[in-house]
UniProtKB/Swiss-Prot annotation:
UniProt name for this protein: Pyruvate kinase
Residues in the signal sequence: none
Subunit note: Homotetramer.
Similarity remark: Belongs to the pyruvate kinase family.
Disulfide cysteine pairs (residue numbers): none
Gene name for this UniProt entry: pyk
Positions annotated to bind Mg(2+): 221, 245
InterPro entries, alphabetized: Pyr_Knase, Pyrv/PenolPyrv_kinase-like_dom, Pyrv_kinase-like_dom_sf, Pyrv_Knase-like_insert_dom_sf, Pyrv_Knase_brl, Pyrv_Knase_C, Pyrv_Knase_C_sf, Pyrv_Knase_insert_dom_sf
Keyword Disulfide bond assigned: no
Species annotation: Clostridium acetobutylicum (strain ATCC 824 / DSM 792 / JCM 1419 / IAM 19013 / LMG 5710 / NBRC 13948 / NRRL B-527 / VKM B-1787 / 2291 / W)
Binding positions for substrate per the UniProt entry: 32, 244-245, 277
Amino acid sequence: MQKTKMIFTVGPASETEEIVTAFIKAGMNASRHNFSHGDHAEHGGRIALVKKVRAKLNKPVAICLDTKGPEIRTGDFNPSKLELQKGSKFTIVCGEEIVGDATKCSISYKDLYKDVKPGNTILIDDGLVGLTVEAIEGTNVICTVANTGLVGSHKGVNVPNVSIQLPAMTEKDKSDLIFGCKEEIDMVSASFIRKPEDVLAIRKVLNENGGENIQIFSKIENQEGVDNIDAIIEVSDGIMVARGDMGVEIPIQRVPLIQKMIIKKCNAVGKPVITATQMLDSMMRNPRPTRAEASDIANAIFDGTDAIMLSGESANGSYPIEAVTTMAKIAQEAENEINYDKFLAERKGNEKKNTSDVISLGTCTAAADLEASAIITATQTGSTARTVSKYRPKAPVIAVTPSEKVARKLAMSWGVHPIISDKFGSTDELISTSVDKALEAGYVQKGDLVVVAAGVPTNVSGTTNMLKVQVVE
């Protein structure tokens, strides 16, 4: 059973029942819907499709809304694409909307002139063209073109190592989040999170619109987010290492080191972490990945990522089904080489010694020493399963829960396989029901030895305090 979770973006290349079915059968744990593109009607149709197929296949697939976030873009150019020459002067006009040409353009963020100073770098279209700030004249930013390249209408603008005073949540984001609450999504991947207050602002909108149970995965995409990573992790349900904008905002050679650092910090506190962007980028165009891409996926898993993600590969690429099946094969092969004893020893060193952690660690240690077929967790809120997952056991973690929403909240937790059950009564009923459900689902067989972890009393969340070893009958 694959332990690494997978999140695939559903888009124009994959919005059919046949392809979504193939995605779920390949192991999709969450569908991602990118609100940087498309309108509510378009996304509503795709969300409805995923809900239909997951019900048909009886799989607890989560639905993730990815916000557009506070991005900066160029205005219109005439012609819509043109070349800037290295060494030429170029002016960014902040005070008004103008039609751009080879000497000037306007941008969507009108206060840029307040944030930058001479010597700063401005990057256009994922860094394809660099501008060096020479002077600020009124609301105009006077630049020199650092390299010859193409610019065009509505291209992304990045300003590395500059704290941009954009609001963390735009009006569009707020509208999209409210739409997500109505659609009963399970998680938000929040773009361009720079500080914990950004996460709390999103949480406030969700709470005010019936989305209290929606998880927030903060996307770390710039230096400010990296600098505030500990505080951001604390207020987030999980983290996404969003390597696209990160690779523009931060020197590219530092991205792998930051990825490892963020994964390690999330592992230490037991919060899920997703590694994303360009994992199989060449499969947008080709039916087979590059060797480097295969290594990238495997190494993210060896680093300790809970989940891996496809963006354009599954949303807009020419080979969406091949991309998802390739990702699954690479993940499964990598998992065969994981040193689970080493993972467990490392987690033990990070132990905070509260009751839930001690019982969960004991559960994983017992499962390893006894070579148990599975760890079965009975959980009302998902807390027990998440804490056990933190210790990366070799045995699969079967999370038995009476809540469909909780089952989907576990979509990004490494190694956790949720099963829906009836509500639990007594402690004995909780244990027997959980084991029976795991047997019924085919995760264990009669005669298997399993380790059961749960919280008693059953109706109190976050109280993992019981461990039992038993043989399946």
